[in-house]
Amino acid sequence: MIMLSLVMVFSPVFDRLSGYHYVHPALMAGRGSVLQAAIQEQTVVGLPLRLRIPAIHVDAVVERVGIASDGAMDVPKGPLEVGWFDLGPRPGEKGNAVIDGHFGTIKGIPAVFNNLYTLRAGDKIYIEHGQGTITTFVVRELKRFGPTDDAVDVFVSSDGKAHLNLITCEGEWNKITKLYSERLVVFADVE
């Protein structure tokens, strides 16, 4: 399931949407290799198919995203889909599952996470899995980061619990860098 070149295994990954670097938890924990981490992990939930957030009227198809050719975490293809980082845990497994989505208006269509900033602690997030099960997460907090802020806790968790972190852009659009000035992360915990 996890296939990376040696360069990618030993290098942090920069997420162009969120502006974060990702280092696989196996490397952070000193276990030596991504392969060992994959063997040690037992998949207990199916692949995520849909993300539902009733508080902001989101009902989106979940695409699998990995690492793009430029070394960045990939983003969903369209403005209405979300991307699950498939090199990390599945939503509902131990660790931080990460899902990104677009912000703003793209070709006149409000993007899936355009209103993510309106979520509040206690709001529910639902992930529908391939085998028909649903995992419920509860929003813990929202944090804003600058593009260069350290945000390792977005991808890595050491508490042995299942978390879901949603990432989108926010702030002012820079026409030169083609980046937004801030990143919004919604931290949620399995119910």
Explain the meaning of each model-derived region:
Residues 68, 75-82:
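Solvent-exposed edge beta-strands and adjacent loop segments
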Residues 33-35, 74, 95:
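Polar low-complexity intrinsically disordered regions enriched in Ser/Thr and small residues
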Residues 80-100:
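Short beta-strand/loop turn elements enriched in aromatics
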Residues 1-69, 91, 103-191:
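Extended hydrophobic leader/signal-anchor segments used for secretion and membrane insertion
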